[in-house]
Amino acid sequence: MSDRQQVTNAKGERIAIVAGLRTPFAKQATAFHGVSALDMGKMVVNELLARSELDPKLIEQLVYGQVVQMPAAPNIAREIVLGTGMDVSTDAYSVTRACATSFQSAVNVAESIMTGNIEIGIAGGADSSSVLPIGVSKKLAHALVDLNKARSFGQKLQIFRRLGIKDLLPVPPAVAEYSTGLSMGQTAEQMAKTYNISRADQDALAHRSHTLASETWASGHLRDEVMVAHVPPYKQFIERDNNIRENSDLSSYAKLRPAFDKKHGSVTAANSTPLTDGASAIILMSEGRAKALGYQPIGYIKSYAFTAIDVWQDMLMGPSYATPLALKRAGMELEDLTLIEMHEAFAAQTLANMQMFASKKFAEEKLGRNRAIGEIDMSKFNVLGGSLAYGHPFAATGTRLITQVCRELKRRGGGTGLATACAAGGLGAAMIVEVE
C-alpha cells in the first residue's frame, strides 16, 4: 500500500482552494466587542461570496467551527447558511478541534468533494472571546432544575435556602485543559523549561513576528484577503488587525513580567498570542468545476494530517508530529517546501517545535524516523509574520494560515507550502498546498 495520499476525486481532479477571506483580527473587548462568532461568520461568508461573485445557491455544503461555543446557536454552520442567502437545503454542520478547527472544516469539505458527494463547499471558523457563555455554579444549576419541578412555594423556598451568596456568582468559561487543569500558558512554560528556550529567544521571535506583520500590512499584501468589517450598530469599522505592534522595539519586550510562572517563568503577554475575535473562510471546489466556472484557484490541497499526543507534558508539539506525516503523504521532505506557515500560539511553543524539527533524536524516539524532519530555513518561515502578531481567534486560525500561504506562494510565482498548528488536547494539524 502506498504512503502517498490521493487528494483527488474519482475523476482524478484535484481539490481547488478557489478563494479565502477573513475579518481583521481584534483583541478581546475592542473592535468586535459584543459581536458574536456567528455574526462574524456570517459577515465573512457573505463578503467571500460577494467578492468571488459566486451564486450562494451553488454552495452544496458548509462546514464551520467555533471553539468557544454559543449555547443559543450550537450549530453555527447551519445558522450561517440561513443568514447568507444560500439554499435552505444546503448541507451544513459544525466541527470543533480546538485551535485546528478550521483545518478540520477544510478537510471535511475536501473529503466530501473527493467522494463525489459535492463539488462546491465552504469551510472556516470563527471565535469571539468578547461574547462569552457565562455559566452558573453547579449548585445553582442543580437548584434551577429542582425549582422547575417544585410545586409549592414552600418547596421553592427550601431550594433557595440551600444556596449561599457564592453559589449565585457567575462562572466564567474555563481556560484550562479539562483533563489536566493546565492552561495553555502553563503548557508553554513547561515547553520553555523542557527545551531550554530562553526569554530572549522568545522575545526575539515575537519581535520578528510583529515586525514582519507590520511590513506586510504596509506593503498592501493583505488587502485582498482581509475584509473591512462594519460593526453593529454600523457607526464604526475595522479594516486591519489591531494586535500588531507598529514599530516594534525589541528592548521593550524585556520589560514585561512573566504571566504564568511569576517567579521563574519566561512566557509573557508580549511573547504570547492574546485573546482574539475574528472569522475566516475558504471556498473549495473540484478542479473541474472551478475551471468550468472560470475561476483561477489560489491553490490545491496536496496532503493533510492530524495527530494527537499525551496532554500532561509539552502537549503543544502538534506540528512536530503532524508535519512529517503530511510530508510523507505528499511524497516530500521539509527542504522541498517553498514556504512554511506555523501557528505561533506562544513563542516558546513555536521555538520548541522548530527545535524538534531539527532533532534526529526526537525523530528516532518519537516518530520512528531515521532522520530529522529538517532544520527550518527562516527565509521560508512565517515570512509575513504569524499569530503572535495577527492574533488567534481559535477556530479562524487554520483557514487564515491556508489562505495566507496560498496567496503568498501565488505572489512568488507558485510552489508548495506547509500550514501547521498545535491545538489543545495534544492535537496537531498539517496541510501541504501546491500553487501554480
Curated annotation (Swiss-Prot):
GO BP terms, alphabetized: fatty acid beta-oxidation
Active site (record annotation): 99 (acyl-thioester intermediate), 392 (proton acceptor), 422 (proton acceptor)
Enzyme class: transferase
CDD domains tied to this protein: thiolase (cd00751)
Compartments where found: Cytoplasm
UniProt cross-references to InterPro entries, sorted A to Z: Ac-CoA_C-AcTrfase_FadI (IPR012806), Thiolase (IPR002155), Thiolase-like (IPR016039), Thiolase_AS (IPR020610), Thiolase_C (IPR020617), Thiolase_CS (IPR020613), Thiolase_N (IPR020616)
The protein's Enzyme Commission number: 2.3.1.16
Gene Ontology molecular-function annotations: acetyl-CoA C-acyltransferase activity
Pathway where this protein functions: Lipid metabolism; fatty acid beta-oxidation
Acyltransferase is among the record's keywords: yes
Coiled-coil ranges from the UniProt annotation: none
Catalytic activity: an acyl-CoA + acetyl-CoA = a 3-oxoacyl-CoA + CoA
PANTHER family, alphabetized: ACETYL-COA ACETYLTRANSFERASE, CYTOSOLIC, ACETYL-COA C-ACYLTRANSFERASE
Function, in words: Catalyzes the final step of fatty acid oxidation in which acetyl-CoA is released and the CoA ester of a fatty acid two carbons shorter is formed.
HAMAP family assigned to the protein according to its UniProt record, in alphabetical order: FadI
Protein name listed in UniProt: 3-ketoacyl-CoA thiolase
Organism, scientific name: Shewanella sp. (strain ANA-3)
Gene assigned in the entry: fadI
